[in-house]
Amino acid sequence: MAIDLRPFIPFGRGALSQATDPFRAAVEFTLMPMLITNPHLPDNPIVFANPAFLKLTGYEADEVMGRNCRFLQGHGTDPAHVCAIKSAIAAEKPIDIDIINYKKSGEAFWNRLHISPVHNANGRLQHFVSSQLDVTLELSRLVELEKERKTLSIETARSKDQLDYIVEVANIGFWTREFYSGKMTCSAECRRIYGFTPDEPVHFDTILDLVVLEDRMTVVQKAHQAVTGEPYSIEYRIVTRLGETRWLETRAKALTGENPLVLGIVQDVTERKKAEANKALVSREIAHRFKNSMAMVQSIANQTLRNTYDPEQANRLFSERLRALSQAHDMLLKENWAGATIQQICATALAPFNSTFANRIHMSGPHLLVSDRVTVALSLAFYELATNAVKYGALSNEKGVINITWAIMEDKGEKKFHMRWAESRGPEVMQPARRGFGQRLLHSVLAEELKAKCDVEFAASGLLIDVLAPITPEVFPGMGHNVPEQRIA
């Protein structure tokens, strides 16, 4: 914020007088950073700093008032610039100068400084007014342009080997092309990128022969457009003589004249292209998984509301099922969405029941990894079946048990996955009038995802569910041939 000059201190005490109030208002509200100093006070201190100056430097008003402007200087400030400013102030002369100053944060910036004396009607010096402008980007660009100019001068004055070394360090190839003849000179890195030998002559047609057919016409069009003198940039693919496909990026500009000469650089961007492709793949995969998750949430909501008429109970069931879904997703995240083993699925889905029924829930089977969609469906199904077992089945008394087993078996000359949920020693079960959520998951989602046959039997000994599914890479990714076959008793 700017220093509040109200009520105005008399001029003799160092501030602006009421007579200069319109000037003060103009300075305060301009977007240009401005300072006013009083040369009649010791060390020519700041008596006004507008908000734009405080924003530029990062200082608060009370941190700059009463100080000489030299607090903006630092180790990088050129003493010659400081001397020039002192001389102008001593001579009561205006000065324009670019000087390195420092913000409160310690960040250096190029300050385009203008200082001008302000005299009263009698010609007596009254104040100094200064404006600041951060021209760091402008001067940096000028420095970059100067470096480019020097680089081209070095190319002419020094040996070709030195230039080749510079561009090789940056992994950028440099080339020139005579527009009409097509003859080219190439740096060592340029030759490496295209797969040329160090001594072989290079012609534009030599490069064009390497460009894949789909990109060749675009490369030709861009090359012909160079004669206009406009710079161009293009990405295209080549196939080297060793059969390696590479993505290249070329930037070029022609020096126009009677015999135009095209100057260009080339860079191998194959790895960047692969990263972009992987990023796009991940984005599509995330969208796909989000869509699947939303479909599962919608299914859970529909099934819960369809079969539960008490709103409070429906809310509780929906929350429990979403929690089970969340646990399945957490498990998949740990495995980088590569799926999970059936052992992991059982352990995670049945974790809420293990503290009470740990010795009554048994699981066994080989190490089998299933896909992410099957992981979610199995997790929800196991959770629902266990919940129903607590209410009506084997876990509703003191001695009932649940056995979950899975195996790879031979069925009609074909390997198949067999999983069984078997409840025993519980109360006698009766077939319900309608299927519960867990059974619907087994019949619909699992049957669809695993292409499985699902048999449910309400036996006198307890609920018995058998799932039989073919072995496919989509459902069982990376399953080797070393998984032993066995039959579930």
Swiss-Prot record:
Residues 259-341 are annotated as: HWE histidine kinase domain. It is an enzyme of class 2 (transferase). The modification S-4a-FMN cysteine is found at C69. InterPro entries: PAC, PAS, PAS-assoc_C, PAS-like_dom_sf, PAS_fold_3, Sig_transdc_His_kinase_HWE. CDD domains: PAS. Keywords: ATP-binding, Chromophore, Flavoprotein, FMN, Kinase, Nucleotide-binding, Phosphoprotein, Photoreceptor protein, Receptor, Repeat, Sensory transduction, Transferase, Virulence. Residues 93-147, 232-281 form the PAC domain. The keyword Transmembrane does not apply. Pfam families: HWE_HK, PAS_3, PAS_9. FMN binds covalently to cysteine after exposure to blue light and this bond is spontaneously broken in the dark. The modification Phosphohistidine is found at H288. One of its GO terms (molecular function) is photoreceptor activity. Residues 19-93 form the PAS domain. Its EC number is 2.7.13.3. It catalyses: ATP + protein L-histidine = ADP + protein N-phospho-L-histidine. It comes from the Bacteria. Photosensitive kinase that is involved in increased bacterial virulence upon exposure to light. Once ejected from an infected animal host, sunlight acts as an environmental signal that increases the virulence of the bacterium, preparing it for infection of the next host. This photoreceptor protein is directly related to the bacterium's survival and replication within host macrophages. This is Blue-light-activated histidine kinase.
